[in-house]
A protein has these predicted regions:
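Cell-wall glycan-active module
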Residues: 1-171, 186-324
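Extracytoplasmic ligand-binding site segments that recognize negatively charged/polar headgroups
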Residues: 172-186
Length: 324
């Protein structure tokens, strides 16, 4: 199937005369050793799209935010249909996923699910020039998160120097996330690994992306062989008895009338996770590993989508290829 990409027209803008950019270039020159001539070349022609999307704060971030009826159905639909592609991806890169799972203790299906949600297994990595987008977000229109995006721009330039790549050629999402794992530059710098041992950490390389995701989860507290979440029973159709979301935790013995639907291999405090469907609320327990997934994206719905997609991928894989 032919895939046609219609890109927004780009105009080249000179940022070198902006006061804040001049200060930024001086910082990069004196603190990090970048050449003045090189910096001026990069900032002289910043490609700017007239149709680039505004960066909005996610509505599903945090643990205690209220959702609307049916919000889980709408949110999950776009991701849970990717199980077939996930089982194929897991089969194709089985040896690499197995090696990452053994080294970091993260199940193969969870690594695969994150790649599936973040980039649809590499198909949707983003087609924006990351340097240009971060420059725009850092220095235009008094963006409320300008300071954050400047730290990302610094990280991008430093990692491009370390990996010996041209920062002007790196493509990613409209907010600067890169590769199959959709790491922002600071995350890339902190958690990317050279999993194929070629001397480079490349997020557009499948092997490095797989290893880096597993490494990220491990460093954020993933516990091997510990269950992530389980569906629970409760009385009624809508649950409002207690605060829900990953930021609230409870001892299970204090949650009267709430029972797991199946065995849950986790003994610590749990979160109550409410998924608002059209006609009722699904309620789940979430353990420490569920919380770890929210470190990748601070949304209970995101982490639950990862968990449920991982389980669907595991079942699809067993059906198509047999058990691992």
């Amino acid at each position: 199937m032919a895939l046609f990409l219609f890109l927004a027209p780009l105009e080249a803008v000179d940022y070198t005369q902006k006061t804040e950019v001049k200060k930024f270039m001086q910082t990069m020159q004196h603190r990090y050793g970048f050449k003045k001539k090189t910096l001026q070349k990069w900032f002289k022609r910043v490609r700017k799209s007239s149709r680039a999307p505004r960066i909005k704060r996610g509505r599903l971030r945090g643990g205690g935010r209220c959702y609307s009826s049916g919000s889980w159905d709408r949110y999950s639909f776009q991701f849970l249909k990717r199980a077939g592609g996930g089982s194929y991806f897991m089969h194709k890169f089985r040896s690499t996923l197995n090696r990452a799972s053994k080294k970091y203790g993260v199940p193969e299906e969870y690594i695969t699910a994150i790649i599936g949600i973040e980039s649809n297994y590499g198909v949707m990595r983003g087609n924006y020039f990351v340097f240009d987008r971060l420059t725009h977000l850092s220095f235009d229109n008094n963006h409320r998160r300008a300071k954050f995006y400047r730290t990302q721009l610094i990280a991008l330039l430093r990692l491009s120097a370390r990996e010996k790549i041209n920062p002007k050629e790196i493509r990613g999402s409209s907010s600067g996330a890169i590769g199959l794992a959709q790491f922002i530059p600071s995350t890339y710098k902190a958690f990317a690994v050279d999993f194929n041992k070629d001397g480079k950490k490349q997020m557009n390389n499948v092997t490095d992306a797989i290893g880096s995701i597993a490494h990220y989860l491990k460093k954020n507290g993933w516990k091997k062989n510990e269950d992530v979440a389980v569906s629970v029973r409760y009385d009624g159709q809508r649950f409002n008895a207690l605060p829900t979301g990953y930021i609230h935790t409870y001892y299970r013995k204090n949650l009267e009338g709430i029972e797991p639907r199946e065995k849950f291999n986790y003994r610590g405090k749990v979160s109550l996770l409410k998924l608002e469907k059209n006609s009722y609320d699904e309620l789940w327990y979430g353990g420490k590993n569920f919380y770890v997934i929210t470190r990748y994206n601070q949304s209970s719905y995101y982490a639950m989508a990862v968990h449920q997609l991982a389980q669907k991928i595991k079942k699809s894989y067993a059906k198509r290829y047999g058990k691992k």
